[in-house]
């Protein structure tokens, strides 16, 4: 399947979250996109920590685990296996935050600056040096750039007539995105209630063949659009490798 075989249309997006519709794909390919976003796009994550001083109440190993789960911005030109060094030096009283991490690459920093690492009391200090390496989510969850990835069929709504005169006016809830007159409408625009969108009408709902609505959230290691594009690239690379292997 080439990129010309399917069509992508964004419903809404920002740096961290996006909803988009992909058409002309199979359920298997949709699931392949979901899995690729979760496990095939490499990201930077702290892997090794060297403690210079730790007089806090928390053991080195526990702090190392916390640091490993801090999302780091991942430049596009970093390849799997590459590393970057970060340092942290904080004295109490106060709290050491993810934003206190200083990288030797200005393009690499904590994706969120306000993640608490440890609270330090008077005369307590945390000084360390850490190596962050590129890795895949299939090897460790800390490398999953997609923190929430899901998809569902795009649904089309048809008005089939008027509601009976004395019909119960119960809410008819539907969540996601619907297709209406060839336009995409998020259901939260009408509080997810079809009776609000189509008052006094009877409607029928059907799945649109080969069309899926994706909802993707990034941990901040990269913009969500870049995360999706990198995931699709990994699928293309796998397909090319398989084609070459079959030809052999």
Swiss-Prot record:
Class in the EC hierarchy, top level: transferase
GO cellular component: cytoplasm; DNA-directed RNA polymerase complex
PROSITE patterns, sorted: RNA_POL_D_30KD
Subcellular location: Cytoplasm
EC number: 2.7.7.6
Any one GO BP annotation for this protein: DNA-templated transcription
Pfam families in UniProt: RNA_pol_A_bac (PF01000), RNA_pol_L (PF01193)
GO molecular function, one term: DNA-directed RNA polymerase activity
Chief subcellular location: cytoplasm
Xref: InterPro entries: DNA-dir_RNA_pol_30-40kDasu_CS, DNA-dir_RNA_pol_insert, DNA-dir_RNA_pol_RpoA/D/Rpb3, RBP11-like, RNAP_Rpo3/Rpb3/RPAC1, RNApol_insert_sf, Rpo3/RPB3_RNA_Pol_subunit
Reaction equations catalysed: RNA(n) + a ribonucleoside 5'-triphosphate = RNA(n+1) + diphosphate
SMART domains: RPOLD
Keywords, comma-separated and alphabetical: Cytoplasm, DNA-directed RNA polymerase, Nucleotidyltransferase, Transcription, Transferase
Assembly: Part of the RNA polymerase complex.
Protein family per UniProt: Belongs to the archaeal Rpo3/eukaryotic RPB3 RNA polymerase subunit family.
Biological role: DNA-dependent RNA polymerase (RNAP) catalyzes the transcription of DNA into RNA using the four ribonucleoside triphosphates as substrates.
Protein name from the UniProt record: DNA-directed RNA polymerase subunit Rpo3
Organism: Halobacterium salinarum (strain ATCC 700922 / JCM 11081 / NRC-1) (Halobacterium halobium)
Phylogenetic placement of the source organism: Archaea, Methanobacteriati, Methanobacteriota, Stenosarchaea group, Halobacteria
């Amino acid at each position: 399947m080439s990129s010309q075989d399917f069509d992508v249309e964004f419903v809404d997006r920002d740096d961290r979250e996006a909803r988009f519709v992909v058409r002309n794909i199979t359920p298997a390919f949709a699931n392949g996109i979901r899995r690729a976003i979760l496990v095939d796009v490499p990201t930077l994550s702290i892997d090794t920590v060297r403690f210079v001083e730790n007089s806090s109440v928390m053991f080195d190993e526990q702090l190392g685990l916390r640091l490993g789960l801090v999302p780091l911005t991942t430049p596009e030109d970093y390849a799997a296996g590459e590393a970057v060094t970060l340092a942290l030096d904080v004295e109490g009283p106060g709290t050491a935050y993810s934003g206190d991490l200083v990288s030797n690459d200005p393009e690499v920093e904590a994706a969120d600056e306000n993640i608490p690492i440890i609270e330090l009391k008077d005369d307590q200090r945390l000084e360390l040096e850490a190596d962050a390496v590129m890795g895949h989510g299939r090897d460790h969850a800390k490398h999953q750039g997609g923190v929430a990835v899901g998809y569902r069929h795009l649904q089309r709504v048809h008005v089939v007539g008027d509601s009976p005169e004395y019909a119960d006016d119960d809410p008819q809830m539907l969540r996601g995105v619907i297709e209406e007159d060839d336009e995409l409408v998020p259901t939260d625009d009408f509080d997810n209630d079809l009776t609000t969108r189509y008052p006094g009408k009877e409607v029928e709902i059907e799945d649109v063949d080969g069309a899926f609505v994706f909802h993707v959230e990034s941990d901040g290691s990269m913009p969500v659009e870049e995360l999706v594009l990198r995931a699709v690239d990994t699928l293309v690379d796998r397909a090319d490798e398989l084609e070459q292997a079959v030809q052999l």
